[in-house]
């Protein structure tokens, strides 16, 4: 368990931060950009959880824990199999959940406008932020070694959040399609 007696360390005042291997990197480095985007995704999911309960809340809480682990994987340069927290089984779980949720939804006939119920709107925002996290992880992977399961997980997560948003709108009987009245 982590115990912090002080929140500030002053070690980042020069524009650098520490990674878990004790190395220092600039706060604008691709690795820190990716970690920050993952943190933003988790925070957006936390806001969405204000409108959830039961299984949906538990699912989103588990995803937040996964994102914490994903950020921890990103904070470790290199790739050691014993060190990885995000593994293919988590990607497969997201896929199963996507398939299960999608079974109860009507087929898509147009693009979906973000919005609808408050929960759906928050899930769409989390989805868009997760796409930013994905782009940041892809950029990092272009420069350094990244656990391939991280890319798979964050890619599936945006799909998962999209399907959850559709389900939230269906349950709230409030769906928005991208069909303009002409």
Predicted regions and their residues:
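Phosphate/pyrophosphate-binding loop motifs in nucleotide- or prenyl diphosphate-using proteins
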Residues: 1-182
């Amino acid at each position: 368990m982590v115990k912090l007696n002080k929140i500030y360390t002053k070690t980042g005042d020069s524009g650098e931060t520490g990674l878990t291997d004790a190395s220092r990197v600039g706060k604008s480095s691709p690795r820190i950009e990716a970690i920050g985007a993952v943190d933003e995704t988790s925070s957006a999911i936390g806001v969405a959880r204000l409108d959830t309960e039961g299984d949906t809340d538990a699912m989103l809480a588990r995803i937040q824990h996964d994102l914490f682990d994903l950020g921890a994987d990103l904070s470790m340069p290199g790739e050691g199999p014993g060190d990885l927290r995000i593994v293919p089984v988590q990607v497969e779980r997201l896929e199963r959940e996507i398939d299960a949720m999608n079974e109860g939804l009507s087929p898509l006939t147009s693009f979906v406008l973000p919005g609808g119920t408050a929960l759906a709107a928050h899930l769409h925002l989390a989805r868009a932020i997760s796409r930013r996290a994905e782009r940041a992880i892809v950029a990092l992977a272009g420069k350094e070694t990244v656990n391939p399961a991280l890319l798979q997980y964050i890619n599936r997560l945006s799909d998962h959040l999209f399907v959850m948003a559709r389900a939230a709108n269906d349950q709230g009987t409030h769906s928005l399609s991208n069909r303009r009245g002409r």
